[in-house]
Amino acid sequence: LAKSAISAQISIPGSKSLTNRELVLSALASGPSEILNPLDSRDSNLMIQALKQLGSEIESTPNSLRITPRPISGPAQIDCGLAGTVMRFVPPVAALAKGEISFDGDVAARSRPMKTTVDSLRALGVEVSGSGLPFTIHGTGEVVGGELSIDASESSQFVSGLLLVAARFKNGLTLNHTGKTLPSMPHIDMTIDTLAKRGLKVSKLSETSWQIEPGEISGRTVEIEPDLSNAGPFMAAALVAGGTVTIENWPTSTTQVGNDFVSLLALMGGQVSRNGTGMSVTGTGEINGIEIDLSSAGELTPVIAALAALAKSKSVISGVAHLRGHETDRLKALVDEINSIGGRATETKDGLIVEPADLRGGLWKTYGDHRMATAGAIIGLRVPGIEIEDITVTSKTMPGFELLWNKMLGATS
């Protein structure tokens, strides 16, 4: 519970999305790479272990990772945990190996959408047994590539996973997305951007079609930006408690969807402005409802829904049907938890409606989902007696979340 207005400067750890993309590219590169300010979390550690299993040498120092690529080789057993990036980015890498590579993860991971990854590898001539986790790739040491059509409606990670590895396919790859919707387009732009910085040209043939020629992926030294999606709960805190929160080292240009918080929080009543190298949000404690299509930035939904539950007017969030296949069914989880503490939330076919209500304390369940935990923390700033079931699930992408949260609350104005 925030006892008074906040005045805090927060340094957020590195971006998970960027860390895991750069790790994959470093493992596939023609020479060594160094990643500065990488995220140290369960998801990034699972990625490191997976790439080590496939032959890469990865040495970690306190603020960097040094990656020396080696031939991708099996046999190996890959633990995906609950990390979508591991389960969807590593199989195309493993397909380049000779031998059997088996994949499994947490029990909850077995229900996450994986069929598109498996089907796409089969369509490229890779032998795969199983249709979702657990499954095994029987690699021959090369992937021919060519043209491929997939339906990535459930996750843009299906597209990114193939694009990251495509330059190592014998004939490169022309990839077409055939589904009606393509969520989280900025994540694909991020993938294309990381490839370009390593000397690879991705031709965007259309909004849903990409081409990569075979070629060398160069090693590089790269500094990882702070994770702007993880900055969201801290920025939201300024709107809930009043006061100012500044996120340090906010990038001047970025492909991260978390950058959308700048415009979203302004719409909900925050004053958002650049402050030197940081981004500051000032709030009064009064929150406006919002009508917004979050199809390109679905992972921001839990923060926006938490603010909506505390807002003075109705909110409608749309374009996020794909959240049903995240760490948990996030739409159902958000509605259930908001309503369990006296809120008025309803699920729609592709989102949520949240209406103003008097909230009361109670248990906020986390469903093993880091973003459900941080959504509960936001509501707990204003509503006395909110108990977060398991705050440790935040370590999936942000170890030390609760320490930083308490430090922010200690820094009152």
What is each model feature region?
Residues 1-413:
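Short, structured segments at the rim of ligand-binding sites
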